[in-house]
């Protein structure tokens, strides 16, 4: 427990020590008074001189006066102690009340922090899920792009093969046409030679 303002453990201990010392003094004084009374009783039983009796009586009066002062001082110190204890009790209750209010506020703050932390974790998880989904979509897109590139290459190769085939086909056609022309010319030439020979033979007859 925190030490109240205006009051310290050392101060409390000093007051208690002073009260104990006062109680010891009172007990000693009461013991001395008791002894003096016994002396007075003995003086009554055994005759003593007037001077001795007056001296003892004076000392008894002084001790009674000192005893009364000590009791008054003790009462004042006890009153101070009770007042101080009352202040300590009030301050302790106030401190306990403030402690409960602080713990309640701290609990509320912790709860809010946990809620915010939970929201933050949820947002991070959501962002990670979105990022993962985007990465997957990018992978799929890259795969499609690669497929398209491969198809484009295949189409390009097929076009080139087709061009080569068309070129070979044209060459072949040209060659066939050329051969046909050559053969046709040879055929015509051979036919002309035969006709010329057939015209020459009748003349010889």
UniProtKB/Swiss-Prot annotation:
It holds the Pfam family SPATA24. It comes from the Eukaryota. Keywords: Coiled coil, Cytoplasm, Developmental protein, Differentiation, DNA-binding, Nucleus, Spermatogenesis, Transcription, Transcription regulation. The keyword Nucleus applies. Its main location: cytoplasm. Residues 138-185 are annotated as: Required for interaction with CBX5 and TBPL1. Residues 17-166 form a coiled coil. Residues 186-205 have a biased composition (Basic residues). One of its GO terms (biological process) is spermatogenesis. Binds DNA with high affinity but does not bind to TATA boxes. Synergises with GMNN and TBP in activation of TATA box-containing promoters and with GMNN and TBPL1 in activation of the NF1 TATA-less promoter. May play a role in cytoplasm movement and removal during spermiogenesis. This is Spermatogenesis-associated protein 24. It comes from Homo sapiens (Human).
């Amino acid at each position: 427990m925190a030490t109240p303002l205006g009051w310290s453990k050392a101060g409390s201990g000093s007051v208690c020590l002073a009260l104990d010392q006062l109680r010891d003094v009172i007990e000693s004084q009461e013991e001395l008074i008791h002894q003096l009374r016994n002396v007075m009783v003995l003086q009554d039983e055994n005759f003593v001189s007037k001077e001795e009796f007056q001296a003892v009586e004076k000392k008894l009066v002084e001790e009674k006066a000192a005893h009364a002062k000590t009791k008054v001082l003790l009462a004042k110190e006890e009153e101070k102690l009770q007042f101080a204890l009352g202040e300590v009790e009030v301050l302790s209750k106030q401190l306990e009340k403030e402690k409960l209010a602080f713990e309640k506020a701290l609990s509320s703050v912790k709860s809010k922090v946990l809620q915010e932390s939970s929201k933050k974790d949820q947002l991070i998880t959501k962002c990670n899920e979105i990022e993962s989904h985007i990465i997957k979509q990018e992978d799929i897109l890259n795969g499609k792009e690669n497929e398209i590139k491969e198809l484009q290459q295949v189409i390009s190769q097929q076009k080139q093969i087709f061009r080569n085939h068309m070129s070979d086909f044209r060459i072949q056609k040209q060659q066939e046409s050329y051969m046909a022309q050559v053969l046709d010319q040879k055929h015509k030439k051979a036919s002309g030679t035969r006709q010329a020979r057939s015209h020459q033979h009748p003349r010889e007859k």
